Regions:
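Vicinal oxygen chelate
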Residues: 1-4, 35, 89-130
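Exposed loop/turn and edge beta-strand positions of beta-sandwich/beta-sheet ligand-binding modules
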Residues: 7, 42, 70, 110-111
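N-terminal beta-strand motif that seeds the catalytic metal site of vicinal oxygen chelate
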Residues: 1-19, 71-74, 127-130
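Short amphipathic alpha-helices within nucleic acid-binding modules
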Residues: 24, 82-87
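Helix N-cap motif at beta-to-alpha junctions
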Residues: 17-18, 78-82
Length: 130
């Protein structure tokens, strides 16, 4: 099954203040490579060599979602989202947090993803870019 994965994509971090977070990560050597929105959420990708952080700021007035902590998920790239999800289900994982893949044509240039839950409650994102 490991041949399905192309590599590490990113670690997501919730933030209450996008500008403050971007300033902090730029100050320590990060580079903002993309900014986007998902509904009313603000999103930014900050690169450090091979590591990418996805900063997520909830809509104005909303708190960071309860139970997700400051690191809500990590993501891995796949070439074929349907094939990867089928292989994971075949391996006995049935804790997908989204009932089907999500297609987001306007987020970071276009992507589709599917989330499932690991044994300790961690959220894992399968990510295919357009």
């Amino acid at each position: 099954m490991k041949e399905l994965y192309k590599g590490f994509a990113h670690v997501a971090i919730n933030t209450a203040d996008m500008a403050e977070s971007i300033a902090f990560y730029e100050k320590i050597g990060g580079e903002v490579t993309a900014r986007s929105t998902a509904g009313e959420k603000q999103l930014a990708l900050v690169a450090f060599g091979g590591l990418v952080l996805e900063l997520i700021q909830p809509p104005a007035g909303e708190l960071v979602p309860s139970g997700t902590g400051s690191i809500p998920h990590f993501a891995v790239y796949v070439d074929d989202l349907e094939k990867a999800a089928a292989a994971i289900k075949e391996a006995g994982v049935h804790t997908f947090t989204t009932p089907e893949k999500r297609v987001l044509p306007d987020t970071f240039g276009g992507l589709q993803n599917w989330f499932f839950t690991g044994p300790s409650g961690e959220q894992i994102e399968l990510l295919q870019m357009f």
